[in-house]
């Protein structure tokens, strides 16, 4: 297990649930499930953004981190939540490359800051 990295979704309310999960609930519930069920000798845990908005994914990541410490490193493995703002800024126009790059870096920085949110 020491060489395994677990790639998981955050614990969120289902699509048919009337009330979306708050970042506080996502953080507490996700941390609880991981601490109770994931072996401590794992190499790390990485989170998917799982269809969340860019902001939701970052806010939820910060709240999960606040519910640490964890016995393994925790980080993000977002695709859409990092790429969408950059792709939107680029809009298929190479003249927008620098703006797209800045949008991508802004999301990376926001998520890196979320990982510093230890409680």
Identify the residue ranges that each predicted region occupies:
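Active-site capping/gating regions of soluble enzymes
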Residues: 1-119
């Amino acid at each position: 297990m020491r060489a395994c990295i677990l790639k998981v979704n955050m614990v969120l309310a289902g699509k048919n649930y009337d009330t979306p999960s708050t970042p506080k609930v996502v953080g507490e519930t996700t941390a609880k499930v991981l601490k109770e069920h994931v072996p401590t000798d794992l190499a790390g845990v990485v989170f998917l953004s799982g269809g969340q908005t860019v902001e939701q994914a970052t806010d939820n990541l910060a709240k999960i981190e606040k519910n640490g410490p964890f016995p393994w490193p925790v980080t993000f493995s977002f695709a859409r939540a990092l790429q969408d703002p950059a792709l939107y800024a680029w809009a298929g126009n190479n003249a927008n490359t620098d703006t797209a790059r800045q949008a991508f870096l802004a999301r990376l920085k926001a998520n890196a800051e979320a990982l510093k949110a230890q409680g």
